């Protein structure tokens, strides 16, 4: 009874002392925090810590000097008052001798020398859990040297001794000294982990040499940041009000009172575990090095001594040791012992009748023992009975904080190379009451973060196996008791996460066989600058879309790396290259979309994944979901589109991503929620663009929208638009069909301009792109080629009839009735020529073109080819979203018979020659519009006109001349002004034509040619010559000459090339008058003819060599032209 009162009285006294110290420490921390904040927030430069420290030392020395001087003066005065007869010199000498003696005494009181026997003179708070029986203590010295058992700090209190304040302070100070010595350096820690016995023997062999302790710098450390063991962190928290209660309980319920038989069993088990330490430490050196510091304080020497003798030695030492200033400074670190113990979580076992629980006699209020530095190797799973861990092992941070230890034996089978696993689930029957009282230390240190990151995914999946094992043990289910503020410390249950995902899964891993995945778009943009991949999950049975989600390419690659690292033998296709995601070319976009579809299809074709991989895939498809907002009432269609504008001299023609929204008859294009383009469909024409492999713009699933800004003029805006799939294109065209206005058909252009057409228009001569609204449209997903079969009637008759209109080089018969005679003579063999043409182009889809003025005014018709050889099946037409485009009756068309394109501008060269032509130099056949322009320029000295082809004429007059040529096919430009004067003597001067107007008309005709100047088929041949001889212009000229003489270039194209380049040569020769040298001509005609400068320049420089059989111009006589026009 007296002992209990004494203990209670000592405990209350200690609590009061700790409360006072805690207040002192809080004030000190606030002061330090205030100093640090003031230093960081100062605008002006404040002195550094080293400068302040140096100044502080100087001031302290100065104050000490002043105090010493004052003390000496006081002694002198005192001695003079006592002995007035003594002289001043004698008194000063005596005072000086006294000061020297006191200084020597202070110096000898600093620190005792460090000797090999210092362990015996230090108060050790670490006592082993198992107490050795007397026979074992006497006869098992070898075992003591080779086996280090887990220890827990205890405070020895005898029955007849009370815990005084001074006694407690001495114990705390000694614990600090022991802790600091164990954390002396990482090198010593690692050595102690690998061989505790060896490091102990080295310490015993060290000479008894005195060590001088010096401090060059004081470091302000937060109490929470000390490198302490988990046990020390738990016991040193100043915020824990029950910290002294725990210390006292550690003594009252010390493991020294446990039965010797139980301790002997656990010691035997620890010996078997010690044999596997070396192998485990190699794999988990980080964890071992962190946790081992908590156990190196207890040495075999201290374990060999009896508890009673050890307490007596330490008690005697505490009496001899007092509090010096140095020890008080060390006491400042005491709060680090108390910081982390506040709010931990214990596991308390419910009623259990397991026989194994007899081993543990420790009270439930006892704090958990520290974890041992090692854990069990999976290689010993076959000998589980002989290697059962101690109860304290189950709470080891090495086991519980190591992610891979949550693997069970079953989950390890799913991996080809299973990682290191623990036998914890298989050893659940060995759990004792002590393991249920064990609480988990704080989170692992920073050094192990990289290892946890690699193993984190596996632990989150298989950790439920550990929970299930704990709950199914024979000892009963675990019961968690939370103390106040217990959320800051994790426990066994908090670390072992559930197998279920922490996020809701839309599809469970076992349901992968019921879904299929489809990549909808790689152009999706969701509030980010980078494009994402939009993916849909579709129910395999019903075919309906379940939900959508978007992923960046970075996240896609992360999943790919994860699967290939966990399942190396999984046959997965390669993801698209990074270059494919850095371009917006429609063909490249289509390619990467197909590759991604194949990739995800192969993933979901795998019958079964390991649990961790399956959960990772389920989390991948269940995050970043995209909720499709309800479409607005005025929105007919919306989606991502690729847009390209026609190229100019200063602009580019690259593809850009736009989000299109069709509202009523207006198509709005947005770039990052900013409206950039607005297209009015009621005054626009639409034509399809075929998918050709040699398209240099990479057009795929595209169409052209031409918006006419103002009727009567040639001003129009062209928009080249591509979708990601052909089905998506048909959906857009189906939505557009409701807003095409037939009244705008007269102003629709019949073909795309030559300067902004892509290679999709590079069909053979005589083929055309039909406009949307007067053409049939393919309903299948196959590449659709657009052509006009109605214009190919009888080439032989056409040529013979057109030759009747040829006159001499000075004039031409401009009678327009010749065209009607031509139509009458050519109608007989129309059907025969049509069948022949279809036989040659069986893979093409025919499109009928209605561009005549009369038929265009009637209606805009869309017809379907009913030929049996058409690859478009009836089923595909019915299923096609664009079938409403094709339901327009073609009965009105059949009554009028076949229609012939009668427009000059925009028609092929052969068509223009059939309609009207002239002989140039009695050799070359030229369309009438070209011949009339050349005639006017030569007769009116246009080749000497300054700025010819560079200065633009009146757009109104040019448009008027275009319409007249389209209707009359031939207009005498040399007499045009006279006809204007004859009609109206007071006509405005703006109606007259000039050199710049005629040159602008010629450029307009060349720009509207649906094919290249020398033919689309011959383009690659000329380009090959340039590429092979790009540094040798002479060889380029000779190569062009061979191509011209070989007859590969059709006569019609050759005639136009000869006439045009001869004109440019003569303009270049008069460059001193017209200021149009070779460089300026190349700048103007390269975009007009849609050919690069490197291909255009030889035709002008070496005209005589290429067309007239002359010699190439010598290298020194050539004019250097260094021009680069973008996208030409």
UniProtKB/Swiss-Prot annotation:
Where is this chain's protein located in or outside the cell? Cytoplasm
Question: Composition bias, kind Pro residues: at what positions?
Answer: 366-375
Listed A to Z, the keywords are: Cytoplasm, GTPase activation, Phosphoprotein
Q: Which residues form the Rho-GAP domain?
A: 913-1128
What Pfam families does the entry give?
PH, PX, RhoGAP
**Which N-terminal residues, if any, form the signal peptide?**
none
Which GO cellular component terms are attached?
cell cortex; cell tip; cellular bud tip; cytoplasm; incipient cellular bud site; mating projection tip; plasma membrane; site of polarized growth
Do you know which InterPro entries this protein is assigned to?
PH-like_dom_sf (IPR011993), PH_domain (IPR001849), PX_dom (IPR001683), PX_dom_sf (IPR036871), Rho-GAP (IPR050729), Rho_GTPase_activation_prot (IPR008936), RhoGAP_dom (IPR000198)
Compositionally skewed regions (Low complexity) per UniProt? 796-815
Tell me the residues on which Phosphoserine occurs. Answer: 254
Establish whether keyword Cytoplasm is in the entry: yes
Site feature Arginine finger: at which residues? 950
Supply one GO molecular-function term. phosphatidylinositol-3-phosphate binding
Q: Name one GO biological process term.
A: negative regulation of Rho protein signal transduction
Feature: compositional bias, Polar residues? 209-230, 382-391, 420-478, 752-764, 816-829
Kindly give the SMART domains that the UniProt entry links to this protein: PH, PX, RhoGAP
Q: Where is this region: Disordered?
A: 194-241, 345-391, 418-486, 746-777, 796-838
Q: Does the keyword Phosphoprotein apply?
A: yes
The PH domain sits at: 634-741
Q: What else is known?
A: Present with 752 molecules/cell in log phase SD medium.
Query: What does this protein's UniProt record list under function?
Result: GTPase-activating protein (GAP) for CDC42 and less efficiently for RHO1. Negative regulator of the pheromone-response pathway through the STE20 protein kinase.
Q: What is this protein called?
A: GTPase-activating protein BEM3
What is the native source organism of this protein?
Saccharomyces cerevisiae (strain ATCC 204508 / S288c) (Baker's yeast)
């Amino acid at each position: 009874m007296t002992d209990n009162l004494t203990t209670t009285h000592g405990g209350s006294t200690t609590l009061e002392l700790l409360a006072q110290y805690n207040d002192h420490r809080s004030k000190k921390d606030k002061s330090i925090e205030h100093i640090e904040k003031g230093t960081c927030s100062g605008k002006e430069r404040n002195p550094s810590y080293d400068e302040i420290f140096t100044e502080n030392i100087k001031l302290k020395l100065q104050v000490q000097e002043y105090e010493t001087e004052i003390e000496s003066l006081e002694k002198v005065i005192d001695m003079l008052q006592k002995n007035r007869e003594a002289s001043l010199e004698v008194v000063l000498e005596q005072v000086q001798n006294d000061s020297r003696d006191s200084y020597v005494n202070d110096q000898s009181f600093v620190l005792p020398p460090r000797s090999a026997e210092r362990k015996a003179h230090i108060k050790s708070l670490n006592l082993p859990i198992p107490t050795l029986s007397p026979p074992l203590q006497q006869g098992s010295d070898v075992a003591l040297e080779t086996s280090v058992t887990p220890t827990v700090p205890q405070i020895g209190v005898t029955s007849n001794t009370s815990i005084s304040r001074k006694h407690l302070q001495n114990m705390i100070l000694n614990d600090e000294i022991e802790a600091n010595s164990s954390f002396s350096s990482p090198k010593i820690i690692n050595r102690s982990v690998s061989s505790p016995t060896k490091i102990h023997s080295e310490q015993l062999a060290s000479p008894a040499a005195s060590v001088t302790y010096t401090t060059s710098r004081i470091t302000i450390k937060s109490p929470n940041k000390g490198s302490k063991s988990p046990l020390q962190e738990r016991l040193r928290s100043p915020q824990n009000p029950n910290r002294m209660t725990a210390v006292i309980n550690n003594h009252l319920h010390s493991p020294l009172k446990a039965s010797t038989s139980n301790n002997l069993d656990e010691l035997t088990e620890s010996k078997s575990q010690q044999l596997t330490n070396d192998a485990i430490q190699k794999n988990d050196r980080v964890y071992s090095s962190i946790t081992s510091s908590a156990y190196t304080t207890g040495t075999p020497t201290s374990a060999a001594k009896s508890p009673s003798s050890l307490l007596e030695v330490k008690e005697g030492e505490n009496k001899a040791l007092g509090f010096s200033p140095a020890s008080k400074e060390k006491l400042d670190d005491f709060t680090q012992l108390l910081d982390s113990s506040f709010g931990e979580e214990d596991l308390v076992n419910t009623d259990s009748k397991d026989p194994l629980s007899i081993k543990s006699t420790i009270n439930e209020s006892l704090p958990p023992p520290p974890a041992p530095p090692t854990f069990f190797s999976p290689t010993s799973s076959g000998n589980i009975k002989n290697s059962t861990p101690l109860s304290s092992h189950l709470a080891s941070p090495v086991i519980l904080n190591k992610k891979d230890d949550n693997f069970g034996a079953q989950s390890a089978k799913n991996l080809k190379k299973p990682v290191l696993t623990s036998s914890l689930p298989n050893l659940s029957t060995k759990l004792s009451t002590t393991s249920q009282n064990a609480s988990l230390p704080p989170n692992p240190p920073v050094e192990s973060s990289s290892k946890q990151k690699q193993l984190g995914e596996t632990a989150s999946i298989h950790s439920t196996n550990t929970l299930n094992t704990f709950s199914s043990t024979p000892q009963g289910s675990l019961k968690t008791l939370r103390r106040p503020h217990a959320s800051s410390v994790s426990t066994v249950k908090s670390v072992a996460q559930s197998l279920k995902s922490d996020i809701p899964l839309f599809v469970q891993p076992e349901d992968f066989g019921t879904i299929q995945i489809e990549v909808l778009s790689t152009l999706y943009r969701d509030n980010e600058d980078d494009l994402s991949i939009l993916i849909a999950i579709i129910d395999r049975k019903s075919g309906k879309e379940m939900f959508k989600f978007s992923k960046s390419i970075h996240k896609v690659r992360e999943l790919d790396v994860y699967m290939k690292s966990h399942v190396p033998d999984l046959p997965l296709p390669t993801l698209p290259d990074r270059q494919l995601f850095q371009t917006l070319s429609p063909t490249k976009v289509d390619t990467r979309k197909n590759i991604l579809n194949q990739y995800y299809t192969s993933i979901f074709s795998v019958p079964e994944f390991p649990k961790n991989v399956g959960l990772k895939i389920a989390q991948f498809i269940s995050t970043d979901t995209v909720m499709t907002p309800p479409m607005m009432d005025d929105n007919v269609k919306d989606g991502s589109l690729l847009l390209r504008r026609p190229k100019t001299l200063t602009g580019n023609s690259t593809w850009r991503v736009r989000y299109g929204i069709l509202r009523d008859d207006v198509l709005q294009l947005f770039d990052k929620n900013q409206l950039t383009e607005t297209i009015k469909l009621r005054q626009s024409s639409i034509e399809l663009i075929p998918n050709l492999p040699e398209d240099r713009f990479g057009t795929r699933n595209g169409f052209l929208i031409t918006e006419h800004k103002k009727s009567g003029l040639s001003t129009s805006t062209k928009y080249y638009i591509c979708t990601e799939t052909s089905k998506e294109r048909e959906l857009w065209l189906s939505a557009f069909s409701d807003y095409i206005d037939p009244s705008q058909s007269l102003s629709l252009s019949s073909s795309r301009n030559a300067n902004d057409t892509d290679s999709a228009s590079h069909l053979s001569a005589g083929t055309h792109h039909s406009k949307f609204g007067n053409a049939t449209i393919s309903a299948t997903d196959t590449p659709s080629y657009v052509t006009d079969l109605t214009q190919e009637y009888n080439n032989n008759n056409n040529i013979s009839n057109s030759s009747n209109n040829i006159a001499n080089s000075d004039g031409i018969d401009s009678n327009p009735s010749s065209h009607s005679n031509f139509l009458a003579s050519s109608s007989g063999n129309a059907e025969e020529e049509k069948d022949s043409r279809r036989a040659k182009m069986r893979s093409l889809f025919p499109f009928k073109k209605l561009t005549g003025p009369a038929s265009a005014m009637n209606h805009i018709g869309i017809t379907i080819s009913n030929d049996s050889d058409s690859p478009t099946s009836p089923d595909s037409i019915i299923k096609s979203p664009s079938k409403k485009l094709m339901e327009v009756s073609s009965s009105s068309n059949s009554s009028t018979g076949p229609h012939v394109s009668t427009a000059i501008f925009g028609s092929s060269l052969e068509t223009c020659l059939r309609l009207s032509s002239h002989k140039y130099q009695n050799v070359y056949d030229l369309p009438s519009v070209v011949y009339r322009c050349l005639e006017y320029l030569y007769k009116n000295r246009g080749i000497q006109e300054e700025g010819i082809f560079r200065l633009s004429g009146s757009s109104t007059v040019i448009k008027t001349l275009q319409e007249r040529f389209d209707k009359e096919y031939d207009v005498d430009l040399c007499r045009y002004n006279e006809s204007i004067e004859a009609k109206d003597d007071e006509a405005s001067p703006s109606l007259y034509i000039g050199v710049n107007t005629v040159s602008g008309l010629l450029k307009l005709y060349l720009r509207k040619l649906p094919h290249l100047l020398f033919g689309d088929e011959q383009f690659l041949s000329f380009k090959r010559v340039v590429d092979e001889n790009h540094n040798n212009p002479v060889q380029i000229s000779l190569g062009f000459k061979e191509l011209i003489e070989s007859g590969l270039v059709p006569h019609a194209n050759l005639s136009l090339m000869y006439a045009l380049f001869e004109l440019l040569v003569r303009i270049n020769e008069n460059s001193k008058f017209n200021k149009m040298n070779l460089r300026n001509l190349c700048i103007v005609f390269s975009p007009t003819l849609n050919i690069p400068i490197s291909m255009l320049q030889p035709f002008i420089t070496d005209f005589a060599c290429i067309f007239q059989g002359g010699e190439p111009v010598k290298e020194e006589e050539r004019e250097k032209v260094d021009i680069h026009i973008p996208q030409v």
